[in-house]
Amino acid sequence: MSKEELLEFPGVVTELLPNATFRVKLENEHEIIAHTAGKMRKNRIRVLAGDKVLVEMTPYDLTKGRITYRFK
C-alpha cells in the first residue's frame, strides 16, 4: 500500500491499554485502537492519556490505527 492511501486524523488518547496500544478519540467523535509507530518506539517518545496525537489509518479497517506524532 502506498502512503497516498493512508488517512490521517488528529485525536486525543483516552486510555492506555496493554502491549503499547491506546484508545484514541478522533476529532470526528469515533474511538479507535491505535499503536505507536516504530520510529516513536525507537526514539522512546512517551504517549500518555490526554495527549494530542496524529493517527494514520488505512481505508480498509477504520477501527485500528498507528500513532505517528505526539503534539507538544
Swiss-Prot record:
Compartments where located: Cytoplasm
GO molecular function, one term: translation initiation factor activity
CDD domains named among the record's database cross-references: S1_IF1
Residues of the S1-like domain: 1-72
PANTHER family recorded: TRANSLATION INITIATION FACTOR IF-1, CHLOROPLASTIC
Assembly: Component of the 30S ribosomal translation pre-initiation complex which assembles on the 30S ribosome in the order IF-2 and IF-3, IF-1 and N-formylmethionyl-tRNA(fMet); mRNA recruitment can occur at any time during PIC assembly.
Protein name, UniProt field: Translation initiation factor IF-1
Species this protein is from: Parvibaculum lavamentivorans (strain DS-1 / DSM 13023 / NCIMB 13966)
Lineage: Bacteria, Pseudomonadati, Pseudomonadota, Alphaproteobacteria, Hyphomicrobiales
